[in-house]
């Protein structure tokens, strides 16, 4: 199916198969689709609503076109789709260091702020990490620091064909949710935060169509794209060879206290950098630490090193209290800057 046929099908509200969506994405990613065709397709798909099969087909092509990072061993990614308007601090980025301190190798894939004030790239840069590394530089961080960061624009060169169109049409499209599914290090373990419950289930089903080994797709209380402390959280567990499993987990279920969403608010880059340092150093021991423990626990479960979230919280706490989480940050800064 070519993109003109796909536009006609989607306008008629017909869902594409995974293979058809992949075929269209090939045209977009190799530059043969025109800007007008890309805009028409993305807009029509947005109006119809993307299916998990369509998302998976497009993600598979985007993964293949990415500049790959090669690492000999399993890696996990922790990220969210954004767009929740909650203005929390960089929870998943902080949790990544805690998970790394507990033994996981974290291949974080992210960008600068889109809908927030401070994205993962912004806070890491503020912490002193060199964020614009090439594939070998990231692989070196994974090997020597246990955590690496892939700055999305640098690893998805084929996005140059769709990027200008996305900016011009100015609406959220399927590309807003493809980023977290297209890790250049081919992370087969993942924690993916989603602001919409319906989209969370859809992305969980999309991950099950890809080569995922174990993932937790989480939707926080109040529509946050992280596990949060304000109430019950919805979790979809994706495990290779198993049916999708749905869970509801409240903070008290894993030994943590509830806290209002306002307690997790972030600020500008300088503010969030100070927060990350305070949490990893053990100085901040309030709800911001607790929400990091909860999200790091999810990574430890998805990464198959913790049997359940309650155990994961204990392991995450030990990662901070032992100094291992902060050491991962210091190590990542040094390795990324060529100082180690």
Swiss-Prot record:
Positions contributing to anthranilate 2 binding: 166
Cofactor note: Binds 2 magnesium ions per monomer.
Entry's Gene Ontology BP terms: L-tryptophan biosynthetic process
Binding annotation for Mg(2+) 2: 225-226
Entry-linked SUPFAM superfamilies: Nucleoside phosphorylase/phosphoribosyltransferase catalytic domain (SSF52418), Nucleoside phosphorylase/phosphoribosyltransferase N-terminal domain (SSF47648)
Principal EC category: transferase
Identification of the protein by name: Anthranilate phosphoribosyltransferase
A GO term for molecular function: anthranilate phosphoribosyltransferase activity
Binding site for anthranilate 1: 80, 111
Residues that hold 5-phospho-alpha-D-ribose 1-diphosphate according to the record: 80, 83-84, 88, 90-93, 108-116, 120
GO cellular component, one term: cytosol
Pfam families: Glycos_trans_3N, Glycos_transf_3
Assigned protein family: Belongs to the anthranilate phosphoribosyltransferase family.
């Amino acid at each position: 199916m070519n993109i003109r046929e796909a536009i006609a099908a989607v306008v008629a509200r017909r869902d594409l198969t995974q293979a058809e969506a992949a075929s269209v994405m090939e045209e977009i990613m190799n530059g043969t689709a025109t800007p007008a065709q890309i805009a028409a397709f993305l807009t029509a798909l947005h109006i119809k609503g993307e299916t998990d099969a369509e998302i998976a087909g497009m993600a598979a092509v985007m993964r293949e076109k990415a500049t790959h990072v090669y690492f000999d061993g399993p890696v996990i990614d922790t990220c969210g789709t954004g767009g929740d308007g909650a203005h929390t601090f960089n929870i998943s980025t902080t949790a990544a260091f805690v998970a790394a301190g507990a033994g996981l190798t974290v291949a974080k894939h992210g960008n600068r702020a889109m809908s927030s004030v401070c994205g993962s790239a912004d806070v890491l840069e503020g912490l002193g990490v060199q964020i614009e590394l090439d594939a070998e530089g990231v692989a070196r961080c994974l090997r020597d620091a246990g955590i690496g960061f892939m700055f999305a624009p640098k690893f998805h060169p084929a996005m140059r064909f769709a990027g200008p169109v996305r900016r011009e049409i100015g609406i959220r499209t399927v590309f807003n949710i493809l980023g977290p599914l297209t890790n250049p290090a081919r992370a087969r373990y993942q924690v993916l935060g989603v602001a919409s419950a319906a989209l969370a289930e859809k992305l969980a089903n999309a991950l099950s169509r890809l080569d995922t080994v174990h993932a937790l797709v989480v939707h926080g209380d109040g529509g946050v794209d992280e596990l949060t402390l304000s109430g019950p959280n919805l979790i979809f567990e994706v495990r290779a060879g198993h049916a999708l499993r749905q869970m509801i987990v409240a903070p008290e279920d894993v030994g943590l206290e509830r806290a209002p969403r306002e307690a997790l608010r972030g600020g500008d880059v300088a503010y969030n950098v100070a927060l990350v340092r305070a949490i990893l150093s053990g100085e901040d021991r309030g709800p911001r630490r607790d929400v990091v423990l909860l999200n790091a626990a999810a990574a430890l479960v998805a990464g198959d090193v913790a049997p359940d979230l309650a155990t994961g919280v204990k392991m995450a706490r030990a990662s901070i209290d032992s100094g291992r989480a902060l050491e991962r940050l210091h190590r990542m800064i040094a390795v990324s800057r060529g100082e180690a």
